[in-house]
Swiss-Prot record:
Taxonomic lineage from the root: Archaea, Methanobacteriati, Methanobacteriota, Methanomada group, Methanobacteria
The name this protein goes by in its record: Methyl-coenzyme M reductase II operon protein D
InterPro entries: Me_CoM_Rdtase_D (IPR003901)
Superkingdom of this protein's organism: Archaea
Gene Ontology BP annotations: methanogenesis
Amino acid sequence: MEKMEKVEFIDVKVVPYRLLNPQTVETILNKIYDLDGIVRVLVHGPSIPKEIPYGPAKGIKVNHKDRQVIKVKGEEVELKVKVGEIIVGVLCDDKMDENIGKIEKIMDENLPCSYQMWVGTYTKRDVTVTDWMKYGPKFEKKLDPRYIGLVDPNSKVKENVKLIK
């Protein structure tokens, strides 16, 4: 098996004490993507379904005010979660500490509540059997390394991952 180019980065995990509204998420993501050395950004939180998935009301549309389309660097991104956690991948280079400080400043200026921030490894870095199941054999040459660890093998990538350049 041939090795794909490895991207060395560290994760900065930000957990606000409250779930964030779409406008706050849009502002924060745009400011983070303005920084140099950002590899990827993941948002995580409770799902906001389009329809009720099970039970007696199964199939009925859910009209949730926070399931919105936001613009991040000119790209439209549909928020499918109520954001409660942001993980930012920062390149391990000479600007890493500076970028971590800038991320902290962005959070201080834009979050309406207190938060906790940790630096460490919170996402997968290496190809696993799950990735092989999802993408098939010999995918290493074709796959952007930023996809590693982002998608459940049973989900559709384009429904759950949005690459912002």
